[in-house]
């Protein structure tokens, strides 16, 4: 138990050190950005939040795609119907495909 808690303490210290280093580097970049407002590199720092948002959106889409795949596999395994993955206004991950029958 003591070895486990000391390992967690080391991990926490390591995380704190990494976060402190990132914060320090962020401040340094912000200071450089403020001092050189006419520099073309300044636009790179301003576009960075959109990159983070794009990365987050991509990760979300991958997660949804994995959920859709799992739902599709489950539906195919437990049903004789046919299903497709499609975005739904109601939040459904998969939709059943219903054939149109000619009225008799």
UniProtKB/Swiss-Prot annotation:
A GO CC term attached to the entry: SOSS complex
Residues bearing PTM Phosphoserine: 50
Location of the protein in the cell: Nucleus
Pfam families attached to this UniProt entry: SOSSC
Any one GO biological process: DNA damage response
Family the UniProt entry places it in: Belongs to the SOSS-C family.
Role noted for this protein: Component of the SOSS complex, a multiprotein complex that functions downstream of the MRN complex to promote DNA repair and G2/M checkpoint. The SOSS complex associates with single-stranded DNA at DNA lesions and influences diverse endpoints in the cellular DNA damage response including cell-cycle checkpoint activation, recombinational repair and maintenance of genomic stability. Required for efficient homologous recombination-dependent repair of double-strand breaks (DSBs) and ATM-dependent signaling pathways.
Protein name: SOSS complex subunit C
Organism annotation: Homo sapiens
